[in-house]
């Protein structure tokens, strides 16, 4: 069958996630092109594993910085802009000793007081990987990883295999977003 480029798939997923969040701005004005991110996190009502699409009924305006921050290596400009804008708009309310808070809700003023390592960690790892690519390089130096990838059928990209060009992928991506009701 067709091979999947998981990097490009991650870029497309990040773009779809951002578009989904932008479309939430009609209900939650704090969301927009430069402030976006929904993923499992704390909320005023406790821990929630929200996401989308489709529109999860638990979405109530909480923004999770690690959702954008975890995509720094896939969409560096968009994810960096999101983190910078969150920091500029909300400052010390959402950024402290360990970096960004886990989650915050601009609509209600709620800010999580917990520091959740997996969410703080993904921002740190993604930033370092975006900057140096060391994280991926070190990961692949672990001898078990290439063997595991081979055993599950993941192979390196072969440029001699015909792949859709960027225009084809862009058209397909926009079609998928329209089909999902995001455009």
Please give the residue ranges for each predicted region.
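Ser/Thr/Asn(+Pro)-rich, low-complexity disordered segments
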Residues: 1-183
């Amino acid at each position: 069958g067709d091979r999947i480029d998981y990097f490009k798939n991650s870029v497309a997923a990040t773009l779809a996630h951002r578009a989904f969040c932008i479309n939430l701005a009609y209900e939650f004005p704090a969301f927009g092109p430069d402030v976006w991110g929904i993923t499992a996190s704390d909320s005023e009502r406790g821990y929630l594993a929200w996401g989308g699409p489709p529109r999860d009924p638990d979405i109530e305006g909480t923004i999770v910085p690690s959702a954008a921050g975890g995509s720094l290596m896939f969409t560096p400009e968009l994810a960096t802009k999101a983190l910078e804008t969150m920091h500029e708009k909300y400052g010390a309310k959402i950024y402290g000793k360990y970096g960004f808070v886990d989650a915050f809700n601009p609509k209600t003023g709620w800010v999580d007081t917990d520091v959740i390592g997996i969410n703080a960690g993904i921002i740190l790892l993604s930033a370092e990987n975006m900057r140096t690519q060391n994280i991926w390089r070190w990961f692949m130096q672990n001898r078990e990883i290439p063997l595991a990838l081979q055993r599950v059928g993941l192979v390196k990209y072969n440029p001699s295999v015909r792949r859709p060009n960027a225009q084809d992928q862009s058209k397909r991506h926009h079609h998928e977003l329209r089909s999902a009701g995001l455009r």
